[in-house]
Amino acid sequence: MVLTDLYGRPVLSLRIQLNTTCNFNCFFCHMEGTEISGEALKPEEIERVVKIAHKFGVNKIKLTGGEPTLRRDLIDIVKRIRKYITGNISMTTNGVMLPILAYELKKAGLDRVNISMHAFDEDTFQAITGVNSRDRIIKAIDAANEAGLTPVKINFVVLRDLNVDQIPDMIELAAEKHAILQLIEYETTREGESSKEYLKYHMPLDSLEKEIADKALSIERNELHNRPRYIIRTQAGEVKVEFVKPQRNPDFCAHCTRLRITSEGEFKTCLMRSDTNVKFKGINDEKTISELFRQAVLRREPYWRPGDEVRQNEVLAKSIIQNKRK
């Protein structure tokens, strides 16, 4: 039986945060809406909550971090999840460990990966991530393809005056590697919109999307968040470019069918909120966890509502003023 929240949104998938540690230091990382924490959920705890979620109709899992490949028990975790989930199991990763782990992850039951690559050239890559690993990420994409962790999605957070000029190269790279390129809007909470980093680097993607749409051979829709995906032709062949535009986007929230699980053992109803979290860590009784799961679903509500998109103009005005003062 699929559970539906009070806004008519079914919960069809889980986004499971395996840890909060990472070997990159991207300044815009939202850390899945959590803080750096200590002990993470054990494999058997993750298995238990997946088993319960599956009883409620969940059949799709996304593994995230931090950086999930830093967990030494990652293969075991994937195997445990696959016992219950017949749908898609995917993982978001920076890719550093993929050349080593790709085949074992596929064998364990992982279907595909999202690989974060926020710049095409080495200098910008290092400026964003704090590490000199651009070439290794290219190898990670190749390793994922060779292992069958496909289709690979390349996550690219668009940052004004930092990596926008590299989007054409990223599109060609995605086409060459038979990957899907996800152009992702830099997102934050309402309070975070006034931060220096956000005002400096946030860029609405509407004009960029129109440019891509004008070149598109066809368009698809990702049911999650109703995200548009354009098929365009490049020198390396056809490629899919998907736009992820969450900031002040009521339509994005209206199509959210995902419940999050934090590494500390909480059901998290929304990336942007922690006040509605429901803790299940330390509870072994499946009946009790099932009830907590129900509670979490009923606490879900859209973060962005109709009318919030209008205030985006105020945020843009602040950004323009700040950048003129540079």
Swiss-Prot record:
Reactions performed catalytically: GTP + AH2 + S-adenosyl-L-methionine = (8S)-3',8-cyclo-7,8-dihydroguanosine 5'-triphosphate + 5'-deoxyadenosine + L-methionine + A + H(+)
Binding site residues for S-adenosyl-L-methionine: G66, S116
CDD domains: Radical_SAM, Twitch_MoaA
Cofactor annotation comment: Binds 2 [4Fe-4S] clusters. Binds 1 [4Fe-4S] cluster coordinated with 3 cysteines and an exchangeable S-adenosyl-L-methionine and 1 [4Fe-4S] cluster coordinated with 3 cysteines and the GTP-derived substrate.
Binding-site residues, [4Fe-4S] cluster 1: C22, C26, C29
Enzyme class: lyase
Domain Radical SAM core: residue ranges: 6-235
Residues annotated to bind [4Fe-4S] cluster 2: C253, C256, C270
MF annotations from Gene Ontology: 4 iron, 4 sulfur cluster binding; cyclic pyranopterin monophosphate synthase activity; GTP 3',8'-cyclase activity; GTP binding; metal ion binding; S-adenosyl-L-methionine binding
Pathway annotation: Cofactor biosynthesis; molybdopterin biosynthesis
Family matches, as SMART domains: Elp3 (SM00729)
Swiss-Prot/TrEMBL GO biological process terms: Mo-molybdopterin cofactor biosynthetic process
Pfam families found in the cross-reference section: Fer4_12, Mob_synth_C, Radical_SAM
Binding-site positions, GTP: R15, K62, T92, K153, R258, L259, R260
Cofactors, names only: [4Fe-4S] cluster
NCBIfam families with a match to the protein in the record: moaA_archaeal, PRK00164.2-1
Family affiliation: Belongs to the radical SAM superfamily. MoaA family.
Function field: Catalyzes the cyclization of GTP to (8S)-3',8-cyclo-7,8-dihydroguanosine 5'-triphosphate.
Protein name per Swiss-Prot or TrEMBL: Probable GTP 3',8-cyclase
Species this protein is from: Thermoplasma volcanium (strain ATCC 51530 / DSM 4299 / JCM 9571 / NBRC 15438 / GSS1)
